[in-house]
């Protein structure tokens, strides 16, 4: 019973709360939560027929100790944990609402993650679904973010190729391995800054 615990154990539930690592940056997408303590509605947007059983907090992928969400909206007050489902091997989706474009503008390039994927959805009573998607905007790629900090992808790829060529000539790397390494490097520059996960069909 929490009421019978000694004072030093009063915060035990929060200290033992699980953590969900989320594929976003608090400083990019929820800057006002970190800076001002503003609270945003956060809820799962799938598995709605399952009861959530884990008391959790959210942490982002920035490796920054402040990149976390540990205060949430409750029915009549606030709470220090959010009840979520246990994570399986499948992606788990949360919705963070009422953020608006202001958060992204303020976040700018914090932690060099850049813009997230964006979808413009409009309500439409004439559409059978009740809404329509006007457009989708992809988030920044690694190459785009690096270019904003004066590290240009073409120069980086040339320097990588030069190092690979030297390693091949010195017999430290096989030519086939070197070409594969260079292809992986150039492909990585074209990918988005946030983690990407292949679906079950490999796409």
Name each region found by the language model.
Residues 1-203:
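Charged (often Lys/Glu-rich) extended helix/loop segments that serve as interaction or gating elements
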